[in-house]
Amino acid sequence: MSRRMSLTALALLLAPAACSTYVEDRASEAWAPVYPVEEAERLDSLPTGGIYSSTSRGLFVSDRRAARVGDIVTVDFDEKFSASKSQSASGSRKSDYAIDLPDALTLGLDDGVLDNSTDQGFSGKGAASQSNSLRGRMSVSVTRVLPGGNLEIMGQKLLTLNNGNEYVRLKGVVRPEDIGPDNVVTSDRIAHAEIKYIGAGDTADTANAGWLRRGLSVVSPL
């Protein structure tokens, strides 16, 4: 019985070790590629011997930019943000007062003058700064053509390095005219962009505090 309890406790302790990998693997399911729906072969798509076909882009069409569900478009990441903030405040206050008391109250023991002074001061400063950058390229798929003609894109890239995984995920909306002739769009032209760079595995877990330490830090009064 005690051995079974020991094994159960060990399993509970080891379970969080693979938590990040499990969570990100499950999250990857929501970023699965979207493929165009295969429609039944229509009469107007059958070969007729003519050069022009309304269902094909043709051999002589030079514009190969993404335009339909399932098409691939390359995103050029050029993200760089920086922000800084500083604040300072100071204040001072000084007051003096004197009261001339009647001799009847002081019994003639002093000059009858009661004086006092206060001097207060405060000074505080604060500063904060943050910067980040992301550069690189990845290809994503068109998942939906919106009524206005804009394209909803989504995709992810998985990199496995040693004992860890790196996920690069992107979701957003682009205008067809913002896609260059080389079928590349820069990340700053993506509306409602959701860019994620997430690490999972042993390397990422070592950079985070364990679940026990996080729990103790919540309840600790120090």
From Swiss-Prot:
Subcellular localization: Cell outer membrane; Bacterial flagellum basal body
Residue pairs linked by disulfide bridges in the UniProt entry: none
Lipidation (N-palmitoyl cysteine): 19
Signal peptide: 1-18
Listed InterPro entries: Flag_Lring
GO cellular component labels: bacterial-type flagellum basal body, distal rod, L ring; cell outer membrane
Main location: membrane
Coiled-coil ranges (or none): none
Keyword annotations of the record: Bacterial flagellum, Cell outer membrane, Lipoprotein, Membrane, Palmitate, Signal
Lipid-modified residues, S-diacylglycerol cysteine kind: 19
Keyword Membrane (UniProt): yes
Complex formation: The basal body constitutes a major portion of the flagellar organelle and consists of four rings (L,P,S, and M) mounted on a central rod.
Family listed: Belongs to the FlgH family.
Function: Assembles around the rod to form the L-ring and probably protects the motor/basal body from shearing forces during rotation.
Protein's name in the database: Flagellar L-ring protein
Species name: Cereibacter sphaeroides
Designated gene of the protein: flgH
